[in-house]
Amino acid sequence: MSLLHQARFFITVNHLRDLPATAVPEVAFAGRSNAGKSTAINILCNQKRLAFSSKTPGRTQHINYFSVMPAKAEDPLGFLVDLPGYGYAEAPGETKSHWVHLLGDYVKARQQLAGLVIMMDARRPFTDLDCQMVEWFLPTGKPIHVLLTKADKLTNNDASRALMAARKVLADYRAQIDGDVSLTVQLFSSLKRRGIEEAQRIVAGWLCLPEALEAEPQAEPAKKTPSPNAQRG
């Protein structure tokens, strides 16, 4: 069983000054208000009500932390960080301004942030605000993984085209910066439970969870070269 299944609520913060003063890695989840972010987090953690989505899109303005650790452990191994959903057109101006500063400053400056998962509706990926999130985080050189959510709403052909198009966008972003940065994408469906294990592996790897280390392929032992003087039977 993945340690992600044992994630539990840790803290809610509304200002960067209140972020946990811990050194363990964090994986943040971002996305538009209607991209299925909370549902995806719950599915990845195999829980029904870990992350809550407001009945009114755009109302959640806080950063929610969920600790990941074995049941009897005293200290978290890492955190899942649920960022406020963005892009709700009817949100008040002050709320939008708060989102910009909270989201932008967190993803650009949080040292503990190991990677960013961005949820995008597979039918409408890479909106202007999605691209803004990528561009905020890209200069850090840390990995980004895109979940194309609600993939069940597309036919197989349309889903394949959406995946190829998303890979092209990420390749263009990768070409803009120096160095090798991991920008990956996958199809995801909470309804059909598609892509769950792939996403879990990536998140667990970024958090350096024991299950990720155990899953790493082991190098084959080097084969000994017979000595030319070895005695043949």
Curated annotation (Swiss-Prot):
Binding site for GTP: 31-38, 58-62, 82-85, 149-152, 188-190
Molecular function GO terms recorded: GTP binding; metal ion binding
Superkingdom of the source species: Bacteria
Cysteine disulfide partners in this protein: none
Keyword Secreted attached: no
UniProt: Mg(2+) binding residues: S38, T60
SUPFAM superfamilies: P-loop containing nucleoside triphosphate hydrolases
Cofactor(s) needed by this chain: Mg(2+)
Gene3D superfamilies assigned to the protein according to its UniProt record, in alphabetical order: P-loop containing nucleotide triphosphate hydrolases
Keywords, alphabetical: Cell cycle, Cell division, GTP-binding, Magnesium, Metal-binding, Nucleotide-binding, Septation
GO cellular component, one term: cytosol
One of the GO BP terms on file: division septum assembly
Positions of the EngB-type G domain: 23-209
InterPro entries, alphabetized: G_ENGB_dom, GTP-bd, GTP-bd_ribosome_bio_YsxC, P-loop_NTPase
Job of this protein: Necessary for normal cell division and for the maintenance of normal septation.
Annotated PANTHER family: ENGB-TYPE G DOMAIN-CONTAINING PROTEIN (PTHR11649:SF13), MSS1/TRME-RELATED GTP-BINDING PROTEIN (PTHR11649)
UniProt-listed HAMAP family: GTPase_EngB (MF_00321)
Sequence similarity: Belongs to the TRAFAC class TrmE-Era-EngA-EngB-Septin-like GTPase superfamily. EngB GTPase family.
Record protein name field: Probable GTP-binding protein EngB
Annotated organism of origin: Ralstonia pickettii (strain 12J)
Lineage of the species this protein comes from: Bacteria, Pseudomonadati, Pseudomonadota, Betaproteobacteria, Burkholderiales
Gene this protein is translated from: engB
